[in-house]
């Protein structure tokens, strides 16, 4: 039974690589389709600044009067300044 499971997984892996190569050739692109779709998802969610409690890596990621708190998880919080 273990051998048949391994053979099945190997066949599925080969089929995945084969279909990915066929799709890549069909589109004429240098990136796999799944990578392009992930790239589109992340690009659509980019904003000029992060709102309150939004994820950040540095203070510039956050909107005005917010600062990046470096406790895990990092988030944008009020920097105690007034407009």
UniProtKB/Swiss-Prot annotation:
<dbReference type="GO" id="GO:0005576">
    <property type="term" value="C:extracellular region"/>
</dbReference>
<feature type="disulfide bond">
    <location>
        <begin position="49"/>
        <end position="63"/>
    </location>
</feature>
<feature type="disulfide bond">
    <location>
        <begin position="56"/>
        <end position="68"/>
    </location>
</feature>
<dbReference type="Pfam" id="PF07740">
    <property type="entry name" value="Toxin_12"/>
</dbReference>
<keyword id="KW-0960">Knottin</keyword>
<feature type="disulfide bond">
    <location>
        <begin position="62"/>
        <end position="76"/>
    </location>
</feature>
<protein>
    <recommendedName>
        <fullName>U20-theraphotoxin-Cg1a 2</fullName>
    </recommendedName>
</protein>
<feature type="signal peptide">
    <location>
        <begin position="1"/>
        <end position="21"/>
    </location>
</feature>
<comment type="similarity">
    <text>Belongs to the neurotoxin 10 (Hwtx-1) family. 40 (Jztx-35) subfamily.</text>
</comment>
<keyword id="KW-1015">Disulfide bond</keyword>
<keyword id="KW-0732">Signal</keyword>
<keyword id="KW-0800">Toxin</keyword>
<dbReference type="InterPro" id="IPR011696">
    <property type="entry name" value="Huwentoxin-1"/>
</dbReference>
<dbReference type="GO" id="GO:0008200">
    <property type="term" value="F:ion channel inhibitor activity"/>
</dbReference>
<keyword id="KW-0964">Secreted</keyword>
<comment type="function">
    <text>Probable ion channel inhibitor.</text>
</comment>
<keyword id="KW-0872">Ion channel impairing toxin</keyword>
<feature type="propeptide">
    <location>
        <begin position="22"/>
        <end position="47"/>
    </location>
</feature>
<dbReference type="GO" id="GO:0090729">
    <property type="term" value="F:toxin activity"/>
</dbReference>
């Amino acid at each position: 039974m273990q051998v048949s499971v391994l053979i099945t997984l190997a066949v599925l892996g080969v089929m995945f690589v084969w279909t990915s190569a066929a799709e890549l050739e069909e589109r004429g692109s240098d990136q796999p389709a799944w990578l392009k779709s992930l790239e589109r998802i992340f690009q659509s969610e980019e904003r000029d600044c992060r709102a309150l409690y939004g994820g950040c890596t540095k203070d510039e990621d956050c909107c005005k009067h917010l600062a990046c708190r470096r406790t895990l998880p990092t988030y944008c919080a009020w920097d105690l300044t007034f407009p």
